[in-house]
Structure formats: C-alpha cells, structure tokens
Amino acid sequence: MKKLVLFLGVLMILMFTGCGGKKEAADTGEKKLKVGMVLSTGGLGDKSFNDSAYAGLVRAKEDYNIEFNYVEPASISEFGQFLDDYAAAGYDLVVAIGFNMESPLKEVAPNYPDTKFAVVDAVVDEPNVTSILFNSKEGSFMVGAVAGMMTKTDTIGYIGGIDMSFLNEFRDGYVAGAEYVNPNIEVRSLYVGGSNPFNDPAKAKELSLALKNNDADIIYGVAGGSGLGLLEAVSENEDLYAIGVDSDQDGAVEGKVLTSMMKRVDNSLYTITGELVEGKLENGVRMFGIKEGGISTSEFKFTKDLIGEEKLAKIKAIEEKIISGEVVVK
C-alpha cells in the first residue's frame, strides 16, 4: 500500500505597504510549482540517501514555497506506476531516487514531454530528464584513507547491497584510499543480495559479524537501509567500527561511526528545485564531486579525539590534493 504524504505549503498573504519587501508566489497569484518524489526501497528512516533526498526537498519547499509530495514504494515493481501517477497528476518536477529507477523512468518520461524529471544515481537520456550523478569514488577514497589509517588489524570490510558496477565504484574507491595510506591493507567484501538487498538489516548484521570474525575491525556499508544492521553490529561490539554512507550517520552510534561518506543528495535536489523555480532547469547529466560540494566526509563530530589531530590533518591534506588535481581518483 503506497504511503503518500502531502506537504501543503503555507499561504503567505502580504499587505502592500510603503516599506515594500520580499514577494512570495501568493502576491502575484502564481500557481505553486509541484514536486513529487519517488523514494527508493528502504524509504525514510534509512539514515542514508532517502533521508538526504527528503531533507533537500523539505528545505526547497520552505525556501521556494512549492508543494512537495513523496511516496515510499514497497518494491521495485512499483516504481514505474508511481512515476506515472505524479506525471499524470500534473506535477512540474518528478524526482526518482536510486539507480533502479533507470528502466522505469525510460518508459515513463517520453509519455510526458511537458513534465520535467530528475533521477539520482542513474542516466536517462531524454530531453525532459536531469540525471544527477555523484563522484562517489572520490568520497569513498577519502573514507578508505580514514579506515586505512585507523585499522589495528590491517583488515577492513565492505558490505554492498549487490555486486554490480555502480556500487563497486564505492568499493573500488574505498580500496584505493585505504591502499594510498596503508600498503599492507586487506579489504574483504560481502554483499547483502536476496530479494530486498537495500532493506535487509538482519542480513547486513550477519555479514558484519562474519567480517569481524575474519579480522575486519572497520566496515564500510553501502547498502541503503540494510546498513542499519551494520550500525547495530558496531553498537554491540566494542572493537568494531563503521563508516557511514550517503548522509551523516555519525550520530547513529556515537563514537562508533568513524566518519560518513556524504553524498549530498540534499544539496543537489535543492539546487535543481531552485533552477526549476527560476525556469533554468536543463536536461542532461550533472556531476557533483568533492570540488563541486556534492561529496564530502562528515565532520568527525564524535570521533575527533579517537582519530587525533595528526590523522585529521592528513585526511584534510588528501581532500585538498583531490580538489587541486594532485590526486586523481580513477
């Protein structure tokens, strides 16, 4: 059963005075723009890219006075219908979250040439689609360097949702970053798989413990809502640490998430919504990396003392080298 939540914008009625002031859409009688978002499976509460996407559009709703609606599909098979529902209802922008949206959007977008679509983590080559990509390999390189510096066993782990090229970009960047600072590092990789790889915390916890039993003391989880199982595992094991992904997960288990590879889905969706409001949103591929402010590590709020000033300075130096081009993550 689809869960559809409508956020009604607040109608601001401004009185004309000699002082003037900021004009809202209500002043001119303009119709509010409507933005609908189809989340990936796992939905809200994943402490990952769904939550980040939601935060960005809530901010856009408040700042741009738009109407915002979202839906949380129970399965991938529902994606196409929900995209179609929003387009048929006359939404100005329909946002699709996740690489699994590629095929459904390719089918739906051509049927609604006057509707703008945006897709995160996929490329759909249609004249009415904006494809939002992130240089996740750069961010994963950064957190891999953190893991390579902090491991006490020279063995770290990676848990992916499924074994496929898109997610392996995260793994490859993580491995490269760890090897950049620690040539003796070993990286062990496992995958959730199954019928619901991005919303199976129990399986991810099982894999986390398996990696721990094979000497991994730091694990990077790239599996959406399944990553909650990794967080549970580190909360129960004193000598096991996690690295978060997509959003700032550091506070989920304070002091046990060394850092998070933040894919700023929130910033990207806020940006394109502003362009929509201004009539400047264009189709094509948009790439957000560290230099563009689309990728970053979290602020080490709970782990600064654990990591120490010397290592934090080295991490900052690596980031600056990526921005300058001295270090190129391939």
Regions found by a protein language model. Give the residues of each.
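Core hydrophobic alpha-helical membrane-spanning segments
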Residues: F7-I13
